[in-house]
Design a protein with these regions (language model features):
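Gly-rich Lys/Arg/Thr-decorated short loops/hinges at beta-loop-alpha junctions or inter-strand turns
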Residues: 1-9, 130
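Hydrophobic alpha-helical positions that pack around
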Residues: 34-144, 150-157, 165-166
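Alpha-helical ds-nucleic-acid-binding substructure associated with the helix-hairpin-helix region
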Residues: 162
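Long, highly charged amphipathic alpha-helices
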Residues: 19-23, 50, 146
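Histidine-anchored nucleotide/phosphate-binding helix
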Residues: 14-30
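A general structural signal for short secondary-structure junctions and capping/turn motifs
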Residues: 28-29, 116, 177-179
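Ubiquitin system architectures
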Residues: 153-157, 166-185
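Metallocofactor- and cofactor-centric catalytic cores in central/energy metabolism, strongly enriched
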Residues: 9-14, 36-39
Length: 185
């Protein structure tokens, strides 16, 4: 996760990490890949502990955990490919022999492959000048204002609503924005 104020990947990843591991056999078969690298920042102990726990349980899977120093924008896929392989590429990661996915994608696929459940919700970070900053697991289609209200946001507070983070986010005119799969904070 390259956005500095979003924590959805770390929180949801730590809580649902086993599903990511359950997706790996399917993804290895579909992609022809020989191994998987889980990369996270060194300052995310809950996610690191979860990855180590499930890596031990599923020790037959070719998974390596790569810990990166906290450097913005560490989640940027070019940085990850270079960190893990030492290679660079011009257009897309496959040029360096890599497929880069977010842990959220692995979790969603793990839930689908093992339980037949499609991705129908998204964990979003609500932070900034709200009364109760938090991560919220919300169904797709809910209005942003409903999610924001859980964190104590009030329209009259005259705060900016940013969909995403400062790097890739966009300012919304109001909370009448429908939560979609791409939203994460």
């Amino acid at each position: 996760q390259c956005e500095p104020y979003l924590t959805t990947d770390y929180v949801y990843g730590a809580e649902q990490c086993e599903y990511a591991f359950l997706a790996i056999p399917y993804l290895l078969k579909a992609s022809g890949a020989k191994r998987v690298f889980f990369c996270t920042k060194k300052d995310k102990p809950a996610l690191i502990d979860a990855c180590e726990k499930w890596r031990k349980k599923y020790s037959s899977l070719p998974v390596e955990l790569v810990l990166a120093k906290d450097a913005y924008p560490r989640g940027y896929e070019r940085n990850l490919v270079t960190l893990v392989t030492g290679k660079e590429y011009e257009h897309i990661p496959i040029e360096a022999g890599c497929i880069v996915d977010n842990i959220y994608t692995y979790i969603a696929l793990g839930r689908y492959f093992t339980q037949g459940k499609s991705a129908d919700r998204r964990c979003v970070t609500v932070s900034g000048e709200v009364a109760k900053p938090m991560n919220i697991l919300a169904p797709y289609g809910v209005l942003a204002e409903d999610v924001l209200s859980l964190a104590g946001f009030k329209a009259e507070d005259d705060l900016k609503i940013v969909n995403g983070g400062p790097r890739n986010g966009n300012v919304l005119s109001d909370g009448h924005y429908v939560l979609l799969q791409q939203a994460d904070g």
